[in-house]
Amino acid sequence: MNKPIYFSKFLVTEQVFYKSKYTYALVNLKPIVPGHVLIVPLRTTVLNLSDLTMPESQDYFKTLQLIHRFIKWQYKADSINVAIQDGPEAGQSVPHLHTHIIPRYKINNVGDLIYDKLDHWDGNGTLTDWQGRRDEYLGVGGRQARKNNSTSATVDGDELSQGPNVLKPDSQRKVRALTEMKKEAEDLQARLEEFVSSDPGLTQWL
């Protein structure tokens, strides 16, 4: 991973824990829950899913399946959300294609509240026309325009219990330090190598 890696205009090399020929996986600046990671094409001009070439597309979804399996194993998740917000009107917050992988659990399941959180996930990307469409989406048609900002994560009106995998309210989701993200990326890289070596069948996804 010597060559600089960018997420839109942002240098994210030290957040990357896996890289294939056309794709990479990185830890999150403001994860919704522990284990919330992103799959991103290396080519920064890929704004939408349809912008991928055939080789890029094959590599992208192969990487997605590998990291999906790994995150479920690593974080002992019962289920996984796989989310692509394809364009600003769909809630995409950074003008570079990316797929969210988010662990989910039987206990403290927040249901569809996770999608509200995705609407406010922000990597601070900007392109003039693209950002204008994003602002319009948030102002008149965004999910949050239809609901009030939540101060605590609830399900059916009941406040969720505390725990490491509980979805945090936006006020508690702070931008993480680079050193913290670098350490997490290094740990996940080591664990991913262990995961792949534990099952010879997984090498086909590399």
From Swiss-Prot:
Gene3D superfamilies: HIT-like (3.30.428.10). Its main location: cytoplasm. InterPro entries: Bis(5'-adenosyl)-TPase_reg, FHIT, Histidine_triad_CS, HIT-like, HIT-like_sf. Divalent metal cations. Mn(2+) is the preferred ion. GO terms for biological process: nucleoside catabolic process. It is an enzyme of class 3 (hydrolase). Its EC number is 3.6.1.29. It catalyses: P(1),P(3)-bis(5'-adenosyl) triphosphate + H2O = AMP + ADP + 2 H(+). Its cofactor is Mn(2+). Homodimer. This is Bis(5'-adenosyl)-triphosphatase. It comes from Saccharomyces cerevisiae (strain ATCC 204508 / S288c).
